[in-house]
């Protein structure tokens, strides 16, 4: 198994019932695999995954790590829509994230190597993040609310000059955490 693969199983019914779809890598459209976009439970056997409520890796993002999710509330879903998924691109276990107040890496900057449940509690002056840089090996999840709540966005190694680069509608970020439960 390569460092970017894993196994995730989607079920149409709650508690792992009904038709299922097993995925081992990028899947840009569940319907192309003969599976409807209704997902009510998920089992992640290996890897960490980014799931989207629309095909082509669009829409609301959900970060799922190894474990069982017997209904969509367990992955913070608002409904049973799921259209695409891909494994998190991780390279190892060194984590480093820089957050920037302004677009294009301007304004206040703060570095993180550990999870942070409330950015303002660490000295971040605002509740917005307009840009970030991900260094090292690991991936991070950015949350719109404190304590790892609200909409979530995955950022992998690279530069994100604007919140649009991580597919957000706004710069509102209040907590961050590392994706650590990979295998």
From Swiss-Prot:
Molecular function, one GO term: structural constituent of eye lens
Disulfide cysteine pairs (residue numbers): none
InterPro entries: Beta/Gamma-Crystallin, Beta/gamma_crystallin, G_crystallin-like
Pfam families for this protein: Crystall
Domain Beta/gamma crystallin 'Greek key': 6-46, 47-89, 95-136, 138-180
Comment, domains: Has a two-domain beta-structure, folded into four very similar Greek key motifs.
Subunit and interaction comment: Monomer.
Family according to the record: Belongs to the beta/gamma-crystallin family.
Function: Crystallins are the dominant structural components of the vertebrate eye lens.
Name of the molecule in the record: Gamma-crystallin N
Organism: Xenopus tropicalis (Western clawed frog)
């Amino acid at each position: 198994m390569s460092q970017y693969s894993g196994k995730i199983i989607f079920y149409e019914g709650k508690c792992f019932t009904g038709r299922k779809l097993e995925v081992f890598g990028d899947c840009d459209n569940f319907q192309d695999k003969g599976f409807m976009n209704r997902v009510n439970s998920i089992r992640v056997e290996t890897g960490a995954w980014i799931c989207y409520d629309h095909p082509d890796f669009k829409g609301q993002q959900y970060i799922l790590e190894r474990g069982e999710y017997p209904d969509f509330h367990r992955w913070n879903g608002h409904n049973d829509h799921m259209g695409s998924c891909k494994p998190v691109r991780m390279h190892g276990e060194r984590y480093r994230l820089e957050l920037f107040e302004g677009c294009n890496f301007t304004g206040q900057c703060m570095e993180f190597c550990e999870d942070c449940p409330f950015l303002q509690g660490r000295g971040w002056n605002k509740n917005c993040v307009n840009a970030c840089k991900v260094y090292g090996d690991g991936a991070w999840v950015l949350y719109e609310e404190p304590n790892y709540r609200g909409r979530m966005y995955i950022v992998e190694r690279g530069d994100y000059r604007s919140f649009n680069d991580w597919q957000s509608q706004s710069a509102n970020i209040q907590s961050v955490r590392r994706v650590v439960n990979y295998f």
